[in-house]
Regions:
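Acyl-donor (CoA/ACP) binding surface of acyl/acetyltransferases
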Residues: 1-33, 47, 57-165
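Active-site rim helix/loop that mediates acceptor-substrate recognition in acyltransferases
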Residues: 36-57
């Protein structure tokens, strides 16, 4: 099992003990069955094994409060599949857990992991034009705005040499 810690959070890979939480949290558009959740978990575990130093394949971690380490409150990770040659940071928090600084803690710890543990050369991220909370997360994590998307969103980056732990 993989686990990263922040001040308030545990970011970790999920296990079969977390199937009920996957069912509860993977609720779009109409939810998933326990069997589908088992398939999701199997995919997460397969992807985790494919990550190598300098080459993230896909890392999806459950976000847990340290005070409630069994309840998933969000997802975060690093993706190397969607944009080949890039490592992309992602995060999403359950609505009840937003505006608490949790996404910023996730972003900072994932950047540390990408640069210090996985030797990535850079990490990218983006948000929609109306998602200013996510824009601020990337700013607070130290990422630099580099361009606008064709739909008016924002593209951010951080190079390894610019990372400060």
């Amino acid at each position: 099992m993989m686990e990263l810690l922040t001040r308030d959070l545990i970011l970790r890979s999920l296990t079969s003990d977390d199937l009920d939480e996957i069912v509860r949290m993977w609720n779009y558009p109409a939810g998933v069955t326990p069997e589908e959740a088992a398939g999701v978990l199997k995919g997460m575990q397969y992807n985790l094994k494919k990550n190598k130093s300098g080459a993230i394949y896909h890392l999806c971690l459950g976000v847990f409060e340290k005070s409630d380490p069994k309840r998933v409150i969000g997802w975060c990770g690093l993706d190397g599949i969607a944009a080949p040659g890039q490592t992309v940071l992602f995060y999403v928090m359950d609505e009840k857990y937003r505006c608490k600084g949790y996404a910023t803690q996730c972003a900072k710890e994932l950047l540390r992991y990408a640069f210090e543990d996985m030797d990535c050369s850079s990490v990218e991220s983006a948000c929609a034009k109306d998602n200013m909370a996510s824009y601020r997360v990337m700013e607070k994590a130290g990422m630099r705005l580099i361009s606008r998307t064709k739909h008016g969103g924002y593209n951010f980056t951080m190079a390894k040499e610019d990372f400060k732990s």
